[in-house]
Amino acid sequence: MSTSQNLSQTPVKETLLTPRFYTTDFDEMSKLDISSNIDEFEALLQEFRADYNRQHFIRDQEFEQSWNNLDSGTKALFVEFLERSCTAEFSGFLLYKELSRKLDKSNPVIAECFLLMSRDEARHAGFLNKAMSDFNLSLDLGFLTKSRKYTFFAPKFIFYATYLSEKIGYWRYITIYRHLEKHPEHRIYPIFKFFENWCQDENRHGDFFAALLKSQPQLLNNLEARLWCRFFLLSVFATMYLNDFQRSNFYKSIGLDARQYDMQVIRKTNESASRIFPVALNVDQPKFFQYLDQCAVENKKLIEIDQKYNNWFIKKLIKMPIYIKLCSCLIKLYLLPAIPSAHVVSTIR
């Protein structure tokens, strides 16, 4: 009889690129005035109540088999994908659940939206964790709740970052799904069949945060807002690009080129964001992906140094010029002229 290894009680080194757990200023959130956009929130609430994916996340017979046919390298990459995805979904669940509890009295419409989004995130995390059990692994989500460090983000930063996180999640899932529909020989595990409906949850969550941003015009209609939008667009895109550069072999195992995949996802997310953000990044400027490639190369050097050296001081010394190059590339990316998107009509699809 096989035993299940508990991954969440194994210490994990946190970096800027690892999935994080967030908290925010709940008092400030409770004072949000959403009256200018209440009709959209009411419509979104009806969408969440409908729970279109209630019967979607049910494992079928295709899961009931041995996965020993996967080579050890592919299996390790896939399990890491499941673990990171589960951690990210569970992080969303915790944040949304706490927001629903804190806002229940002051803003019941928003509170119920957060509650129903937390339902979706918990469902996703549970489904991913169950998939991990097929490989005799699991995440102790209760232990994870207590043991992980929480990063504080002001509400407006939560809005920007989570809007983009949900929208980029949509484009990641639907891009993989469409690719594997055309090339089923690369579908190494049945969870990918669920991505079409799954990504619609991400899309609806993104629409909710778009509605929050529109209800707070000061977050979209001035110079400060434009600068923050550029910052979060670049942060989310660069984080994904650097992460996926490290894991190109995973994408290769499902028949995708990681760089081409990321370029497609970035372009689509940038286009989606232009419907709500006042600016979009000029991702068609050749230097944009050239600088991202340079960032990915420098980031890989940092990882290799961690693997090669044990002495903390030596590692810091060797890393310093690499950090400077990496920061220089990121600054160059940020300073590339953005594209105004105020003329694009904001719509919720």
UniProtKB/Swiss-Prot annotation:
Q: Where in the cell is it found?
A: Plastid, Chloroplast
A Gene Ontology cellular component where this protein is annotated is: chloroplast
**E.C. no:** 1.14.13.81
Instruction: Say yes or no: keyword Metal-binding present.
Output: yes
User: Which top-level enzyme class is recorded in the Swiss-Prot or TrEMBL entry?
Assistant: oxidoreductase
Coarse class of the protein's main subcellular location: plastid
Q: Which reaction does it catalyse?
A: Mg-protoporphyrin IX 13-monomethyl ester + 3 NADPH + 3 O2 + 2 H(+) = 3,8-divinyl protochlorophyllide a + 3 NADP(+) + 5 H2O
Cofactor(s) needed by this chain: Fe cation
Example GO biological process:
light-independent chlorophyll biosynthetic process
One GO MF term, please?
magnesium-protoporphyrin IX monomethyl ester (oxidative) cyclase activity
Question: Where on the tree of life does the source sit, at the highest rank?
Answer: Eukaryota
UniProt KW keywords: Chlorophyll biosynthesis, Chloroplast, Iron, Metal-binding, NADP, Oxidoreductase, Photosynthesis, Plastid
* Pathway field: Porphyrin-containing compound metabolism; chlorophyll biosynthesis (light-independent)
Q: Give the matching CDD domains.
A: ACSF
User: What family does the entry list?
Assistant: Belongs to the AcsF family.
Free-text function comment from the UniProt entry = Catalyzes the formation of the isocyclic ring in chlorophyll biosynthesis. Mediates the cyclase reaction, which results in the formation of divinylprotochlorophyllide (Pchlide) characteristic of all chlorophylls from magnesium-protoporphyrin IX 13-monomethyl ester (MgPMME).
Q: Can you say what this protein is called? A: Magnesium-protoporphyrin IX monomethyl ester [oxidative] cyclase
- Organism for this UniProt entry: Gracilaria tenuistipitata var. liui (Red alga)
Which lineage do the record's taxonomy fields give for this organism?
Eukaryota, Rhodophyta, Florideophyceae, Rhodymeniophycidae, Gracilariales
Question: Gene name, please?
Answer: acsF
